Amino acid sequence: MKITKLEKKKRLYLMELDNGDKCYITEDTIVRFMLSRDKVISEEELKEIQDFAQFSYGKNLALYHLSFKARTEKEVREYLKKYDIDKNIVSQVIANLKEDKWINDGQYAYAIINTNQLSGDKGPYVLTQKLSQKGISKSTIEENLKEFDFSEVAQRVANKLLKKYEGKLPARALQDKIIQNLTNKGFSYSDAKIAFDDLDSQVDQETTQELIFKELDKQYTKYARKYEGYELKQRLTQVLARKGYDFSDIASALREYL
């Protein structure tokens, strides 16, 4: 077979043969096989050219995708799937990129965890979930998590939460709120509890009284329409307890309020 045409089409070249066959190839393919118009190639050579063109095209696409930011093997595979590249070729591209250090799931995981240590607010459980979604293996994630101590991150987050909620919640509710937020962010309950215990959080009696009377004003208006006497007192006690107030503080406030 003879090459009758080599014409550039954006990032690829259109190669036409005298038997009517056409295929798109990369510039790397032209250089590798020293292709030119009127060159004669065999069926076997054509197959090699087509396979390498797919590989070269796939690698160029992957490198373009990686030029914006680091990505995992799974992310690159999914990107290449959009371009209908043969699965075997995709695997060859991935292997080549890993060999050249363009893809390294271990380094990716380390970088994400390290950034979180410096300025993030996530605990190990949430990080594990996020990295797993990126296709990183459980063993790779665990290996990298072992390199870090999350107590400083938990303490940093706990301090921010304290600033947000202090003076707005009674002591027990404040503890519950901070610990719940920390566990939602991926810290274990024990780490969350330690972080809270290390806080300089003192909800004084005056603040508690102010909060409980403010809450009583709101709840009394709601329940006094339906209840009175003992039943009203019970309803108010229940709702204040759910809000995190101690029963002794509730009883004291109700004696003064009712």
UniProtKB/Swiss-Prot annotation:
Domain of life: Bacteria
Stated name of the protein: Regulatory protein RecX
Function per UniProt: Modulates RecA activity.
One GO BP: regulation of DNA repair
Protein's cellular compartments: Cytoplasm
Stored Gene3D superfamilies: Winged helix-like DNA-binding domain superfamily/Winged helix DNA-binding domain
Sequence similarity: Belongs to the RecX family.
InterPro entries, alphabetized: RecX_HTH_1st, RecX_HTH_2nd, RecX_HTH_3rd, Regulatory_RecX, WH-like_DNA-bd_sf
Organism phylogeny: Bacteria, Bacillati, Bacillota, Bacilli, Lactobacillales
Keyword vocabulary terms for this entry: Cytoplasm
GO cellular component: cytoplasm
